[in-house]
């Protein structure tokens, strides 16, 4: 699905759509608030051997084994630090619960269809299929992410394997 068709899908929603705003480095991103289960501080995780660097490991969340993905590593943010501002956004993605590590969470914004622009097309070296679009609030730009497309099916399979090794 292209960014344009995602925008037209939102056009039928008169009150807009709410996004949880989080930061990675100096950039602000937004994900559909309805996917968010909870926000937690970053705790140490159980590392799983032979998984990509962006899969930090798993944690036990009230009896549920939750794979933890560091989006800063996935987006090649360079050296990442874990400090008091580092948080895990726990997402409910259909039949899966996944945690994503981000630099911080700032607020929840409601965007109307008019405030959401199609995702720009970049060179073939940069995949933009996971972008829903760009949210424009005056001078502020928000990169809207489709988290299911960001974590492709191959990566989701790795997360399932990681979680099953601990369960």
Curated annotation (Swiss-Prot):
Transmembrane segments: none
Annotated SMART domains: CheW
Cytoplasm found in the keyword field: yes
Top-rank taxon: Bacteria
Gene3D superfamilies: CheA-289, Domain 4, SH3 Domains
CDD domains referenced in this protein's UniProt entry, alphabetically: CheW (cd00732)
Cellular localization per UniProt: Cytoplasm
Principal place of residence: cytoplasm
BP GO annotations: chemotaxis; positive regulation of receptor clustering; signal transduction
Any Gene Ontology CC annotation: cytosol
Keywords tagged on the record: Chemotaxis, Cytoplasm
KW Cytoplasm (keyword) present: yes
Domain CheW-like span(s) in chain numbering: 16-156
UniProt xrefs under PROSITE patterns: CHEW
Chain's role: Involved in the transmission of sensory signals from the chemoreceptors to the flagellar motors.
Protein's UniProt name: Chemotaxis protein CheW
Source organism per UniProt: Salmonella typhimurium (strain LT2 / SGSC1412 / ATCC 700720)
Name of the coding gene: cheW
């Amino acid at each position: 699905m292209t960014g344009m068709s995602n925008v037209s899908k939102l056009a039928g929603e008169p009150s807009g759509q709410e996004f949880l705003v989080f930061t990675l480095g100096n950039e602000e991103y937004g994900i559909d608030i309805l996917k968010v289960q909870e926000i937690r501080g970053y705790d140490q995780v159980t590392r799983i051997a032979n998984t990509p660097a962006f899969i930090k490991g798993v944690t036990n969340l009230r009896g549920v084994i939750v794979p933890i993905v560091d989006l800063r590593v996935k987006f090649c943010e360079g050296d990442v630090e874990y400090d008091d501002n580092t948080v895990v956004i726990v997402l409910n993605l259909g039949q899966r619960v996944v945690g994503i590590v981000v630099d911080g969470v700032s607020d929840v914004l409601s965007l109307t269809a008019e405030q959401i622009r199609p995702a720009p097309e970049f060179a073939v070296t940069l995949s933009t299929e996971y972008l829903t679009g760009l949210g424009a609030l005056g001078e502020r730009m928000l990169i809207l992410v489709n988290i299911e497309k960001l974590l492709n099916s191959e990566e989701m399979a790795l997360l399932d394997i990681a979680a099953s090794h601990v369960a």
